[in-house]
Amino acid sequence: MEIRERLEKERLFFDGGMGTMLQSAGLMPGELPELWNLSHADVIQGVHEAYIRAGAQIIKTNTFGCNGLKFGKAHGTPAVSTLVTAAVKLAQKAFQACGEKGCVALDLGPTGKLLQPYGDLPFEEAVSLYAEAVEAGKKAGADLVLIETMSDTYEAKEAILAVKEHSNLPFVVTFTFDEEGKLLSGADVETAMIVASSLGASAVGFNCGLGPKEIS
């Protein structure tokens, strides 16, 4: 059964956070965690393996902030494609090391810049930023894409378009809401869910916004 069908029919367990695990392992404030895919590959794979042993069936790549606004020759850092490829391979190796079968999700977070007209990032450029990571992830063998921590349905659309135009991978979208159940852009939960679902998301959810008290 393909992952697209499994997402629709089964209850699957993702892993947990990567950033907090890397901070515990020595990641310094302001240090780009995606660089650890090359400099601390053993640590990244170790985090993946810990989550797999805990029961995770889907592992996110260490690529949350991996885009051309931070990485590439212009920034004096490795190319996005290099970091994404390394990240996917580390997740795959983790499953192999644990003797388990599972799925690797290419993790895409926000670009970190506001979109026009509220900011200076054009829509087309944002799609292109996501597309670079999507193409590399697909080529490296990712099974699906996780578009996460979206606070704006407009930015979620950009990431979704990149996935649909540059791959045939299924995708999951998660949003982050404030205490009033609103995105930073002002959209409510229902609107966000409708937008993502109508664009073909295999699953829609939320993360990083509300704590247990607010959720209850």
Where does each model-flagged region fall?
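Domain-level signal for soluble alpha/beta catalytic cores
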Residues: 1-216
